[in-house]
From Swiss-Prot:
Keywords: Cell membrane, Glycoprotein, Ion channel, Ion transport, Ligand-gated ion channel, Membrane, Receptor, Signal, Transmembrane, Transmembrane helix, Transport. This is Acetylcholine receptor subunit alpha-type des-2. One of its GO terms (molecular function) is excitatory extracellular ligand-gated monoatomic ion channel activity. Residues 439-455 have a biased composition (Pro residues). The functional receptor is a heteromer of deg-3 and des-2. Interacts with ric-3; which is required for proper receptor folding. Glycans are attached at N52, N96, N224. The keyword Amino-acid biosynthesis does not apply. Belongs to the ligand-gated ion channel (TC 1.A.9) family. Acetylcholine receptor (TC 1.A.9.1) subfamily. It comes from Caenorhabditis elegans.
Amino acid sequence: MLIIIQSLLLATTASLCIADTPVPTQIRLVHDLLDNYDKKAKPMWDNSKPINVSFSMDLYQILELNEPQQYILLNAWIIERWFDEFLYWNPDDYENITELRLPYDSIWLPDTTLYNSLVMKDDDTRRLLNSKLTTDTHRRAALIELLYPTIYKFSCLLDLRFFPFDVQVCTMTFSSWTYDQKGIDYFPYSDKIGTSNYLENEGWYILQTKIKRQEVKYACCPNNYTLLQLTLYLRRKPLFYLVNLIIPTSIITLIAIVGFFTTSSASGMREEKVSLGITTLLSMSILMLMVSDQMPTTSTFIPLIGWFILAMIIVISLGTVVSSVIIAIQKRGSLGERMSKRALKFAKVLAWFTCTSLPPHVEKEHMMEAFDAPTPLVEVRPLQLASVKESVRNKWVSGARRATQRGNSGLALISDKSTDPLIHLSPTAHQPDESISPSAPPVPSSSPLPPPLTPGPADDVVSVASELSSKFLTSRMRPKSQKDNTFAAMQSSIKANRQLAVAEFEWFATVVERTCFVIFVVAFLIITFGINFIGFIHWHQAGVEYGG
C-alpha cells in the first residue's frame, strides 16, 4: 500500500514539473499555425479573390540543346511568392518572430506547371524542400517564398535553316493547371530571367532573356488562364562546325578540282581522274551523313550547311563528268583525224583566255594567216590518194590493152573527165605535157605499146588521155626500189598526219582542261564564300537585334 502511494506522489510531481517547463516560442507558433490549418483549401478569407503568385527564374546552366529531337534541357532555380492569409501571426505574441521555415508538404502550394514539359512526373522535374514564411502585419498575411532547384526538359521548335549560323528562340510556358485566373493569377517578379549565376555553355551564347505575362482563353473553360512565357534567345557558336565540317569540305572540294583539271600525269592519260572523283564523292557523302545525323527529320527546309555540302557534291560530280569528256577529247587524236577549222578557231580563243601556248604547227599556220600567206587549197589525204591511184591504174591498164589489140587504127584512149579524179586534182589537166609532142617519133608496130597519138587543136580529151597514158606507161617501167620509196613516203605521211592529230587534240584537251579549271575554281569560291557569308550576316544581325 505504501508503494502505491509513493508511485502516485512521484507521478503527480513529474506532471507538475512538465507543466511548469516552458515550451519554445517557435514550436508554440508552429502548433498555433497548423492546428486549424488545412493545406487543401485556398488560403484566402474571401474565396472569390485570386491568389497573386509572383514567379522568377535564375538560370544556372543549359545542359543540352538537341537538334534532332528539338528539345532543351536546362538547370534553373525557381522562386514562387504569394500571401497566405491563414498563416498570419502577430510577432508581438511570439517574441517578435517574423520568419519561419516549414516543410513544403505542410502548407498550401500553387500547382505551377510547365506546359511544354517533356517530363510528366513532377518529382523528376523539381525538388521541393522547405518554404519560408514572413509575417506581414499590414496585409495581415504571411508571405510564402518557395525556392527549389529544377531540371526542365521542354520542347522547342528549332529553326535550323541557317545552321550552323542559326539563332534559336525557345519559350517556356508556366501557369496553373487547375486554377484559372480567378483562382491563381501569375505575375513576373522581373521582366528577365536571372543569369548572374549562369555557367557559360560551350555551344551557345545567351543573347537575351524575357518574361512576358499573357492571358489566354481556352475553349474548355469559361475563364481566362494567366500564362507566364519565359523566352531564351540563343545564338550558336559556329567554330566547331567551321573547323570540322565546312573547312574540310572546302579543302576536299578544292583538291578534287585541282586534281580534275591539272595537266595529265606521267602516263600521259587522265583516266585516274575519274577514280579521284568517285573517291571524293564517297567522302562527301560521309560528311553529309554527319550533318544529317544532327538535323531533325523534316522536309520543310534544308539547312544552310546542307546546301553547302550539296553544292560541293554537284561541283565534284560535274568535274568528274567534264574529266570524262576531256579524256574522250584526248583519245580522239589517236584516230588520226585532224581538227576542223571551226574547232581550231574556237580552241585558239580558249587558249588566249587561259594563256595556253599553241602547238608549233598550229602557231606556224596562225602566223601564215596573220601575214596573208598562201596556203594549200586542196588537201588530199594519203588514203584517198592511194585509192585514186589504184582506180586510175586499173582503168589505164585495160585501156592500154585495148589500144594494143587495135594497133595503129588511130583510135584514141579517151578518159571521161567527169569520172577521173586526177583530172580535177591536177592544175594542168587541160595543157599538153611536154613529153608528148607532134615531133615525137612513132612507135614501131612490133612494140607491145601503141604509138602516141598526135593531139589535134580541137580535141583536148584525146590530148589528156594521151598524156595520162604516157605517164602511166612511164610509171610501169619504174624500178621496184622507186615504188618502195613511194610507199614509204605515203606511210610516213600518214604517220605524220596522225602525230599532228594527236598533238592537236592533246593541246585542245589541255585548253579545255584549263578553261574548266578557271570556271570551277570561280564557282567554288562563289559557293563557299557566298553561302557562308549569308549565314554570317544572319548570325551577326541576330546579335545586333537582340543586344548580343
